[in-house]
Amino acid sequence: MATKTKRRRTKGRQMQVRKQRAAPQRPWWLYAGGAAAVVTLAVALALTVFHGGSGSGKKESAGLPDTPDYHSLLVNPSNSQKLMLGTHVGLYVSSDGGRHWRFDALSGDDAMNLARPAGATVWLAGHQVFMKSGDGGTTWSDVRPAGLPSLDIHGFTVDPRNASILYAAVAGQGLYRSGDGGRSFSLASDQVGANVMALAALPDGRILAGDMQQGLLESSDGGASWKQRLRAQVMGLAVNPSNPRRLLATGAGIALSTDGGRSWRSVLDLPDGAGPVAWARSNPQLAYAVGFNRTFYRSADGGKTWGAVG
């Protein structure tokens, strides 16, 4: 029988934003239609999820929690102030757009991905954890799929055209695909996946993979073949649900693409790097990102400029 965990949320507060100057002209090495552009991304992003714990009684903290490894970020589709943050030690929630955070649930699981394709369904996948919520993250159930060589899932995404199609990058193994909503998986590609830390599926059928060794890769045939789009380590990817031509990538900072990932430009340089990144479904101009300097960032203009929340 599936294990379920109850969780509570807190009331929101107003958010203040400190302006952050964008990087002057620090480009990233990119590939756009065969032409190289510069990008220097080098951050290890891992996304996390948590299992079997309750956050009741935990106090709120101002700013990002002081905890190792920020991994994953998810924005509530109907309320852009409600956020989930996956870390190495559990799941945190914010009700005020990232100004305050509270430990919530799932302590002890190193899940490295959060995905909410549509409605109330939320997926959590990572190191020795694979879970699903049907109520927006209030309760969770374990998923034990057939066909995966292990539950060390470093990259995970859901096809926006069909929520039954899932992709999982299994560390040291390859890219696996499910066509039945996660009940079973089969190998889609042994060319990528072993070192992938971020996956994104686009409505036009393409798959993007951020690889530790090969950079940002793109497949237009379900993973059968790949081409390099970024000559750099890309550890975080986010596709704007309202405008899938607008994408964000994180690493040594934040980069923006407005042509579906074919070309990129640096919009914020962060010496300590950035990890989790996410768009708000209810506001296509709003995006959030987590800096490894324990700073939470917000963009209100479609990812072009960023400010520190606090």
Features from the language model and the residues they span:
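Extracellular glycan-interacting surfaces
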Residues: 2-310
